Amino acid sequence: MPTRRLLREEIGERGVQIYESRLRALLEPQFRGQFVAIDVESEDYEVANDAALARDRLWTRRPDSQILIERIGYPAAFNAR
């Protein structure tokens, strides 16, 4: 059954929650300044030096993913639908 497409705001809220609760402590010490693409449904993620590369790698594994991209160690995030 296909997953319902989320609104941009929902992707942002879920992605930030996943980053803050699961990934921040794991990723910031080693990957500060890189990008993490987070699938907000599966909570799978991919880290890369380039936002598009992180997104594309995650889409390769999860073609239907709904992705938030966060710069590790920085406050801004953006949606990569």
Feature map (PLM): residue ranges:
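Short N-terminal "domain-start" leader segments
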Residues: 1-30
